[in-house]
Curated annotation (Swiss-Prot):
One Gene Ontology CC term in the entry: DNA-directed RNA polymerase complex
Family annotation (InterPro entries): DNA-dir_RNA_pol_omega (IPR003716), Pol_omega/Rpo6/RPB6 (IPR006110), RPB6/omega-like_sf (IPR036161)
Keywords recorded for this protein, A-Z: DNA-directed RNA polymerase, Nucleotidyltransferase, Transcription, Transferase
Protein name: DNA-directed RNA polymerase subunit omega
Gene of this entry: rpoZ
Its job: Promotes RNA polymerase assembly. Latches the N- and C-terminal regions of the beta' subunit thereby facilitating its interaction with the beta and alpha subunits.
């Protein structure tokens, strides 16, 4: 799987720090899925998270408490 460019990723968020937080949160939720290994065999969760953010499949909300 080809990684999305940094320019595309940064166009989806307000800063690179928000991007890292959102990707980390999504990667953790992917890892918690018991079927992750079956559905995404050979893919790394952080790579999938960046891909979902670039394609607009993962929506998050930046709040005072963190990313939701």
């Amino acid at each position: 799987m080809k990684q999305p460019s940094l320019d595309i990723l940064l166009s989806k968020v307000d800063s690179k720090y928000t991007l890292v937080l959102a990707a980390a949160k999504r990667a953790r939720t992917l890892m918690e899925d018991p079927e992750f290994e079956v559905n995404y065999r050979g893919s790394k969760p952080v790579s999938l998270a960046f891909d979902e953010i670039a394609k607009g499949k993962y929506h998050f909300e930046l709040t005072r408490e963190g990313i939701k």
